[in-house]
């Protein structure tokens, strides 16, 4: 939700309160709702996940694109988290944005896989494509190209998603009028019934053969988790969440046992399996422990995120977070202390103290301050004294 909004939701776990901008996360299996990020953001009109489960959001009016994890520490009501840094070069900041998607399709060239796409609906009227690469704890980006540009002043690209055949579908709201301030809300020129759908293909490359998802066997679905396309794997996991856990879990165990450990994507395949068990609210703790010690820090960070949300099942959650918060990679450590910020004070503070055994870079310092402030029950503006006491 955007700025100027105030939300209070009664849940089985207590009232969830939010004020001004931010994001909610709902687990339908547990009926669990949380204010996953409370940020100073006018209009959050775009959210996307990369292949490792890291989430990013478009700020719209900013018009920045940011990594969400630094801002997902638990906050005191009315206090915002740290938005962190924009990931778009200044000369390519165009507003307002709407829609965010990562390129993950064999139909598109190999060298653009992992790029992110972001739309603009007024000034630029098109879709920009940016490279995204790791940069220590966080990320950096570089503009690659303007993938779509229109001279039609009514062109309003608002969302996009890769289809099962690897093509890119783009939704054009196509409206003469746009904005809630510039024109009367009941202006007859506002079109509520028409729009356009564009399909973007790469002519020199073949389309992807769509994987069978609906009506597929559990074995077929699990094998689909090896496919390169993120959106296919996303749809497969959604389908598996609708199956009976008693039917899926034994097959997940068997599927993982047959994986080739020498395969380059082995750890990612196991991560997909872990996500399936998490989605069924029956997290496989053997897989979780395995991936917390993975060679790839992307996988370790993803495993810590799973650990964050499964404390109701993983009894040694605090001990595992205490180990992760001293990981050699900053992204894993930050996942761990962000997770700790959601725990009770007596559990959280010892974990946060361990995080000080390692340097806090510019991606980590502000989220760490906020994590300590919340766990200590003090205003973040007064946290400097508390931080000194942890040294």
Predicted feature residues:
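Beta-propeller blade termini and top-face loops
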Residues: 1-207, 211-223, 230, 237, ...
């Amino acid at each position: 939700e955007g700025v100027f909004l105030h939300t209070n939701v009664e849940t089985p776990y207590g009232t969830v309160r939010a004020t001004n901008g931010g994001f909610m996360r709902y687990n339908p299996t547990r009926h669990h709702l949380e204010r996953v990020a409370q940020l100073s953001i006018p209009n959050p009109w775009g959210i996307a996940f990369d292949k490792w489960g890291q989430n990013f959001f478009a700020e719209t009016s900013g018009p920045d694109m940011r990594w969400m994890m630094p801002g997902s520490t638990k906050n005191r009501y009315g206090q915002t988290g740290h938005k962190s840094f924009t990931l778009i070069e200044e000369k390519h900041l165009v507003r307002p944005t709407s829609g965010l998607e990562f390129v993950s399709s064999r139909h598109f060239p190999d060298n653009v896989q992992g790029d992110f796409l972001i739309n603009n609906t007024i000034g630029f009227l098109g879709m920009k494509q940016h490279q995204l690469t790791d940069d220590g704890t966080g990320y950096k980006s570089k503009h690659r190209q303007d993938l779509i540009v229109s001279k039609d002043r009514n062109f309003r690209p608002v969302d996009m998603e890769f289809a099962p055949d690897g093509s890119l579908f783009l939704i054009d709201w196509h409206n003469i009028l746009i904005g809630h301030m510039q024109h009367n809300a009941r202006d007859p020129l506002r079109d509520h019934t028409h729009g356009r759908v564009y399909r973007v293909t790469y002519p020199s490359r073949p389309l992807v053969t769509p994987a069978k998802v609906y009506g597929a066997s559990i074995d077929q679905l699990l094998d689909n988790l090896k496919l390169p396309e993120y959106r296919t794997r996303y749809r497969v996991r959604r389908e598996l969440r609708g199956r009976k856990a008693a039917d899926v879990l034994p097959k997940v165990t068997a599927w993982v046992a047959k994986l080739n450990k020498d395969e380059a994507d082995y750890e990612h395949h196991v991560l997909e399996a872990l996500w399936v068990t998490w989605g069924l609210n029956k997290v496989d703790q053997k897989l979780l422990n395995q991936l917390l010690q993975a060679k790839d820090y992307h996988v370790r960070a993803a495993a810590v995120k799973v650990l964050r949300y499964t404390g109701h099942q993983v009894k040694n959650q605090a001990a595992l977070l205490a180990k992760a918060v001293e990981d050699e990679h900053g992204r894993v450590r930050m996942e761990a202390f962000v997770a700790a910020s959601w725990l009770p004070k007596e559990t959280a503070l010892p974990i946060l103290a361990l995080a000080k055994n390692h340097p806090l870079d510019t991606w980590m310092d502000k989220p760490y301050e906020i994590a300590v402030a919340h766990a200590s029950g003090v205003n973040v503006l007064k946290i400097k004294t508390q931080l000194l006491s942890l040294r």
